[in-house]
Amino acid sequence: MLKIFEKIFGSKHDKDIKKIQPVIQRINELQLSFQSLSDDGLKEMGLQLRSTARGALRPLEEKKQELLSKLSTPDIPLEEADRINDELDTLSEEYEKATVSVLEEILPDTFALVKDTCRRLKGHVYTVMGHDMTWDMVPYDVQLIGGMVLHSGRISEMATGEGKTLVSTLPIFLNALTGRGVHVVTVNDYLAQRDKEWMTPVFEYHGLSVGVILNTMHPFERREQYRCDITYGTNNEFGFDYLRDNMAGSVEEMVQRDFYFAIVDEVDSVLIDEARTPLIISGPVPNADNSKFQEIKPWIDQLVRNQQQLVASYLTDAEKILKTKPGDFDAGLALLRVKRGQPKNSRFIKMLSQQGLAKLVQGTENEFLKDNASRMHEVDDELFYAVDEKAGTIDLTDKGRDFLSRLSHQDSDIFLLPDVGSEIAIIESNASLSAAEKVKQKDAVYRLFADRSERLHNISQLLKAFSLFERDDEYVVQDGKVMIVDEFTGRILPGRRYSDGLHQAIEAKENVRIEGETQTMATITIQNFFRLYKKLAGMTGTAETEASEFYEIYKLDVVVIPTNRPIVRKDMDDLVYKTRREKYNAVVEKVEELQKKGQPVLVGTASVEVSETLSRMLRGKRIAHSVLNAKQHDREAEIVAAAGQKGAVTIATNMAGRGTDIKLGSGVRELGGLFILGSERHESRRIDRQLRGRAGRQGDPGESVFFVSLEDELMRLFGSERVISVMDRLGHEEGDVIEHTMITKSIERAQKKVEEQNFAIRKRLLEYDDVLNQQRDVIYTRRKNGLQKERLTSDIFDLLRDYCDMVVKKYEKAFDPEELEERLLRELSVEFRPESGLFDREGAKGIADKLYETALAFYSRKEKEIPEEIMGQIEKYAVLSVIDKKWREHLREIDSLREGINLRAYGQKDPLLEYKQEAFRLFVVLLQEIELETLSLAFKLFPVNPDEAREIEARQKKEALRQEKLVAQHQAAESIYQHIEESGTSNADNAGDNGPQTVIAEKKPGRNDLCPCGSGKKYKNCHGQQP
């Protein structure tokens, strides 16, 4: 129905392009007129446009500086400060409107200027990443359209080879004229450096400065790069610099400016694929015990082996029953226990390809899932532990607990959590206990709960490491280290770590050195970081399938830009086989056929393991080929460059999907162009589209097809029953293949199901983080205020006034002069001894006023004794150190709250609502503690004598060394959104790792580690070289 309407009225994309066409015509007319100008004349035109843009904004900038100057006056009244802040808010809105207005006015001239600059640069030879490059690019009309879409704050979807990098220069140039700074976000350091060097000639021709932020840069270098008109960098670098700026000890340490305009390259990768993993700065946990996994690993090792033997016996039982009674319920139950006990068992996966068995297992599972899975325990009780592969959770059964207690020679109760509420109630009701004894017994209960919950958590993580994470799939082991493989790109993520003890569990499993734990010090999600920008835009080859998410989360519209030349690539229906073995044999046969013909083929794989399996099979057939995966990625540029040559065979993980351009060799067009052969479907349609997009660039011929088997991960977990039943009905023999549009559509529906589930995770992540985001804004605003002011005396006095009122109010009902005197001496070092009867004579307000005057007099004496500069440092230290310390503690409490909040679903409560209420209560307490401790420190802190100063300096150096060990963490939201769809069901307590695990990016790689820039070289031979 929708397609009929589009044919009659035109699609949304057609209408978007139609609106832009008149401006494109105007740009081309202007560019023709600019051709008559001399080079100096064109540069003069650029200066005029810059002058127009900055001239329109200058009066508002001057007004802002004037207001900020008034606001920084030391003793400005509170009412005046509020009025100025309101005026600044209004001015900010006017400033944004003025920016939009002036840029719309000069857009046609600026785009025409950039186009003519590109024309004049043709033939210009310069260096990009150490290689000579000749400029040969002038924007086409479709690229001008893409540039206008980006400038308007939307997403421009452009096919591979359509020149997205050149398109970006148009809106970058236009917005850089304001002097407010434009950020260009790429997926790795290598692309940031390459794109900066590649496009710099256009910008420098007109005097615009261009910078790049790289992982290895020091803060002073970063500050210089951010001061440029245009700054390239990765989303991680921009995000971590934001967090580091909000941990800075002085204004001079801050590196970033305001967030004005960001253009995100490969926007779907950055804003969607990585949006499940927040950015986190973390530091080492003091006194962390890393031996706990080594202690329990032998038990888990034995437990897993016993489970494997048990599963094997169930498989044998099922086979026996099926020989005489096909479709028998007992056989289905035995196979269901195998699925719950060891879902990745190869013998089980092979059995499922037999006619009717997949349907039997599904039917049996549905029977036990009825009534909120109330009977599923009948299946699981016979196992040592139950695995829910789809949700990523593992649950230890009573049988498993008994086995572990016998193995560890301990009571099985140690694997059960005590009911803290009931235990505390019993202690409270015991009249024979004194208050001190009650406190002691309560502490013992809390300690017992903490010890047991930690042990159970470690057991769960080790079981996950053994059952759900496979070497050469989710991770590889290199140089004695566990290295995570990015599921979307197939690249190794140097220095990143899973969180929540999972990485340590995998290290224990692989018998490598177990690294230390970390704790969160600052965090922000990708979504909330990019919301800081006044204007956001993005470009990619694959955004349309996620258009609704882009709009709902970021308010970004997607516009599909027409190609310069029609795409003639042939996309064929999927070829479906029963087993992986049949599929791999068919892949090898197809590759052999294509190589004999001379047509180059790119075989896309989803994991390192599959790429190596296919490579072994091709070697067996003596077919020459290249392999590009996380283990061999150091030859990436060389392999990709040769992939389009005649007879080339290239096996690649998803690495070859982005940032690569495969050009065809001579004679290849006549053979049909590059052949894309996908060895399985990815869970995201976008990744498959990226792979197909490697062929058919700029009107080149090409072909693409996916080979799929029912044993593939996607089909096993989410495959439609319809596909299985069709295979069964047709009674296919071994090696037979199904090729039908209906099958392809069923597979795409399975992918859509996964995408919807992942969207739910990201949306839930945002709902939870929005709570923390509001709190973060308040804390960072207070911190910035403390950082920028020379003196904070008026802020201290405001806190003092509130403190005096609060303290006196507490003693209003039961006035205790001695306790009040002791408290003031302890908290402020102020002596204040109220006489008896003072409360009756003066009342609460009178006493509060006297207390305020006494404390004020104390502070005034302190100000006279201490030089003003030192006094300013004391106030600043009091504010910043307390905020930093308390915010770290608050983040730890919020993490703990998130971990257990889904259990509230048992009480028929909405976990999100409960989380909001609890987080607000914690935040109110946080603000009260910050105010009290800041005031206390400002009053009690005095300069030290020279000996003490030297001791403090030594401590500060030690602290500085500790700070250097800070690690930047890219953390997945697993602990918050455990089992999102089922948080209200009986599985809520199994809160799972639905979605990616937490990842931690360490601050600096080792000399022999892979360089994080993506070049493929070792760090010591790349960005780690000494200057």
Swiss-Prot record:
Keywords: ATP-binding, Cell inner membrane, Cell membrane, Cytoplasm, Membrane, Metal-binding, Nucleotide-binding, Protein transport, Translocase, Translocation, Transport, Zinc. ATP binds at Q143, G161, E162, G163, K164, T165, D661. The keyword Glycosyltransferase does not apply. Pfam families: P-loop_SecA, SEC-C, SecA_DEAD, SecA_PP_bind, SecA_SW. It catalyses: ATP + H2O + cellular proteinSide 1 = ADP + phosphate + cellular proteinSide 2. It is found in: Cell inner membrane; Cytoplasm. It comes from the Bacteria. GO terms for biological process: intracellular protein transmembrane transport; protein import; protein targeting; protein transport by the Sec complex. Part of the Sec protein translocase complex. Interacts with the SecYEG preprotein conducting channel. Has a central role in coupling the hydrolysis of ATP to the transfer of proteins into and across the cell membrane, serving as an ATP-driven molecular motor driving the stepwise translocation of polypeptide chains across the membrane. Belongs to the SecA family. This is Protein translocase subunit SecA. It comes from Chlorobium limicola (strain DSM 245 / NBRC 103803 / 6330). The gene is secA.
